[in-house]
């Protein structure tokens, strides 16, 4: 088993290319740099999905290289088997099942982490790191009562220790299908405001349930609400056309932002 050199990958399993990407900073005016720390938190990732753990039907050379240069674990546990609570546990160090409102969050949920809570990002900032969250967020945004995507959104990731955020508010299969950068929806036209609802349909955009002939991906397991880019999502939305992402570009955009 090797010692960690520059990067420590953490791969518990739940859906994103995101986490905390902390640029090394010089401390106290000295020339020595702190090691970079990158958390990669992925949904639906099993031990058999990585070639460094024996997968034969897929090749994961970049992850394999990280494993080869760092520490590779063969026994690990997650605080939850689902998205929102596992992220909550990672950032706060608390068991999500002992906290309220830590179930799978809708895309218009309020921020579920108390801004008074000391998070992993706070601790890294105190240690002299610049911190960033890039990719899937799924911990809610905004105050109690839900998120208004048409103005500066606060509290957000920057309210709990991150210097920078470029995030998907919930998941790629949930509305709103937009990116949020430092509390603002990227590319939003103020004359075309976003409305999001998880209880009933809003607006007149077609849905997978009502218009199955318009979908390129067959709806299933609740993924039959508003259609975005031919894909029926969970939840309903209308507005914000100029801000909608293109699904085929998500990985490239997220990777570009993470590198920055």
Region annotations inferred by a language model:
Residues 2-5, 12-15, 20-260:
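Formylglycine-dependent sulfatase
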């Amino acid at each position: 088993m090797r010692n960690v050199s520059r990067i420590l990958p953490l791969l518990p399993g739940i859906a994103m290319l995101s986490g905390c990407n902390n640029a090394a900073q010089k401390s106290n005016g000295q020339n020595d740099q702190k090691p970079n720390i990158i958390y990669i938190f992925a949904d639906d990732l099993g031990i058999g999905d990585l070639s460094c753990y024996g997968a034969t039907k897929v090749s994961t050379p970049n992850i394999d290289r990280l494993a080869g240069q760092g520490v590779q674990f063969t026994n690990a546990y997650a605080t939850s088997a689902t998205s929102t609570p596992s992220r909550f546990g990672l950032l706060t160090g608390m068991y999500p099942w002992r906290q309220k409102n830590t179930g799978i969050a809708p895309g218009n949920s309020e921020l579920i982490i108390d801004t008074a809570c000391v998070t992993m990002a706070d601790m890294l900032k105190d240690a002299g790191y610049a911190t960033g969250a890039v990719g899937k967020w799924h911990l809610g945004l905004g105050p109690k009562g839900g998120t208004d995507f048409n103005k500066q959104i606060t509290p957000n990731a920057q309210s709990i220790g991150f210097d920078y955020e470029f995030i998907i508010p919930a998941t790629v299969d949930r509305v709103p299908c937009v990116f949020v950068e430092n509390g603002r929806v990227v590319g939003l036209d103020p004359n075309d405001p976003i409305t999001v609802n998880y209880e009933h349909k809003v607006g007149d955009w077609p849905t997978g349930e009502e218009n199955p002939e318009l979908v390129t991906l067959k709806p299933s397991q609740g993924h039959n609400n508003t259609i975005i880019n031919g894909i029926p999502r969970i939840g309903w939305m209308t507005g914000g056309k100029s801000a909608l992402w293109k699904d085929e570009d998500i990985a490239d955009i997220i990777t570009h932002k993470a590198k920055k």
